[in-house]
């Protein structure tokens, strides 16, 4: 138990380092940061900030199968996939602990009735984002903030976690495009505190590949 606890603490520590590394670089030379802010367009040259790609979901208990049926066995997908155990379903309510939430978006993808939603990551918005890049470039890459660790290029879709793309979204992507790959360096998921993300995206992709007969490319370098 102590070994697992230490391993989880290592994950948290590494994630925190990645989330704040760019902020620390700015703080180390505040004069340069100030001069830069006066001479450049902040919208185009803003430093990479992982939190810009993340968002705490909101919930609608009226859509929840578990709340509607009053039975715990009706559905537990969000509870099973949440890496922070920050979702509570009780007395016809669905609550997210904002302080514990990792903003990974896995609950959004897992819920079959769209109980969870975010402003920037609706199913339609996610598909459209991929479609624009796949239509405009020879190759499109879907990745996460930890794997990319920089501002995405035009053909790169940066998500909180690749696991926030549901099987339905992958089905639509594979039906319409054959130039979409996942970019995740070897071992990047092993060091992530979103511990359920790798299983989530592999299952979603495998399901969509079975439905379509197409395959998703994987880039690890």
Predicted segments, located by residue:
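Iron-sulfur cluster-binding cysteine motifs and their immediate structural context
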Residues: 71-95, 106-124
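Cofactor-cradling patches in redox/metallo enzymes
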Residues: 160, 164-165, 169-212, 216
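Flexible, charged surface loops at secondary-structure boundaries
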Residues: 131-137, 151-154, 174-176
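Ferredoxin-type iron-sulfur electron-transfer modules and their immediate structural context
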Residues: 1-81, 85, 137-149, 221
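ABC transporter nucleotide-binding domain
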Residues: 99, 121-139
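Active-site regions of enzymes building and remodeling cell-envelope glycoconjugates
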Residues: 153-161
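Short, charged N-terminal beta->alpha structural module
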Residues: 109, 115-116, 141-153
């Amino acid at each position: 138990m102590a070994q697992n606890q230490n391993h989880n603490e290592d994950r948290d520590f590494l994630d925190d380092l990645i989330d704040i590394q760019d902020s620390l670089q700015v703080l180390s030379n505040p004069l340069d940061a100030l001069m830069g802010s006066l001479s450049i367009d902040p919208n185009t040259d803003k430093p990479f900030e992982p939190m810009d790609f993340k968002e705490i979901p909101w919930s609608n208990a009226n859509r929840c199968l578990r709340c509607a049926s009053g039975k715990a066995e009706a559905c537990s997908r969000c509870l099973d996939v949440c890496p922070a155990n920050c979702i509570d379903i009780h007395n016809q309510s669905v609550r997210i602990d904002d302080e514990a939430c990792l903003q990974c978006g896995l609950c959004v993808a897992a819920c079959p009735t769209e109980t969870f939603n975010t402003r920037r990551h609706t199913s339609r918005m996610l598909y459209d984002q991929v479609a624009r890049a796949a239509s405009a470039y020879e190759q499109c890459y879907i990745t996460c903030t930890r794997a990319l660790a920089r501002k995405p290029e035009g053909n790169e879709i940066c998500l909180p976690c690749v696991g926030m793309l549901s099987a339905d979204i992958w089905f639509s992507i594979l039906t319409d495009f054959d130039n979409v790959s996942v970019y995740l360096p070897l071992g990047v998921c092993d060091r992530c505190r979103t511990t359920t993300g790798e299983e989530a995206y592999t299952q979603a992709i495998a399901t969509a590949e079975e439905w379509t007969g197409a395959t998703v490319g994987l880039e690890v370098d």
